[in-house]
Amino acid sequence: MAKKKSNTTTILVPDPLRKSVELATGGKGTVLYTSKGYPTYMTIVPSFNCEDVADDLGTGKHPAFIVDGVDKSEIFIATYQSIIHDGQALSLPYQRPRTSINFNDAKAACIEAGPGFHLMTNWEWAAISFWCMKNGFFPRGNTDYGKSHSHPDKVGLRSRDYGITLTGSGPDTWRHDGTMSGISDLVGHVWEWIDGLQLIDGKIKMPSDNNFCQPENKWPDAGSKIDAVNGIQISDAITKRGWTSQWFRDIAAKEGYDVPVALKRALLCPCDAIAGKSEIPGYVWADNSKKQKSAAFRGGSFVDGATAGVFALDLKYAPSSSYCYIGFRAAKAL
């Protein structure tokens, strides 16, 4: 089937706030507006090809930049973890992020913001993480009750809650690109619900591209399973069930099993540039129990210390789960 025509985004409506943000960030950031007219700060992530970041990811545009078969020249990721105002998810600096929210309510608040807005997807998170890997910069964050566990002199502004800081209040090293123009708080602070990835009976389910409007029951089976062997093993069969965990960098495939390239592109199995590298941050937890349906959250929280990171992933909680250390982030594709 022929690929649909690529489209290019042009933002035509100037205003003082948008202009000031774009000038301050050198064009890396902008301000979009929700359907109710509220400003929301977004970081522009230009598209790239899989072969640009790793040799074993295949070729062609990374799936984060393909939405239902349509190529996108960029995606917009909320610069800050979301708050909810008037029913809509907003990205604003120096706010206490919304937490104690379940997956469905987080997703609904993002959609309520207007056309193209959605809960950040696993494909989008993977793309940003690959960018960090390729550029040799792994952001730190609030991983120890308001400060970095590895650099305790680096702190954010505390909210009224014990470990939560105000969005974007940390240092440059808490941004995805090491500058104040980058996406803040991806590591630590609060875990972030992620759309486009589920673990059901140990089977990995995800859309084939960044089609954030596709119903979950239409997602294809990725063809792989998580087996609770040697921590976490990617396999075509399950021999052991239950809660299990592993450093992302150390996740391996069953001997003789050829991992689909899509799983590497989706950060579910490490590519060669990540595998076994001790400097790669992020721990993975999963529950492959029978009849267990797990939604995904990523990044870690303010209590997770060294296990937090851009490669951190939790696949052991139901979508109905709601905790003080789980929040979310919006994204948009035009």
Predicted regions and their residues:
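Generic structural hydrophobic/aromatic packing signal, biased to beta-strands
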Residues: V45, I77, C110, I128, ...
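Short secondary-structure boundary/capping segments
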Residues: M133-F138, Q198, P207-D209
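Flexible loop/turn segments at secondary-structure boundaries
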Residues: A127, Q198-G202
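Short aromatic-cysteine micro-motif
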Residues: G60-L186
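Charged, compositionally biased non-catalytic regions
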Residues: M1-T30
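Extracellular adhesion/carbohydrate-recognition regions
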Residues: L32-G116, D201-R241, G327-A330
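C-terminal, surface-exposed recognition/capping segments
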Residues: A2-I11, R158-Y162, T173, D177-M180, ...
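Short low-complexity stretches enriched in small and charged residues
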Residues: G27-K36, D144-H149, G282-K290
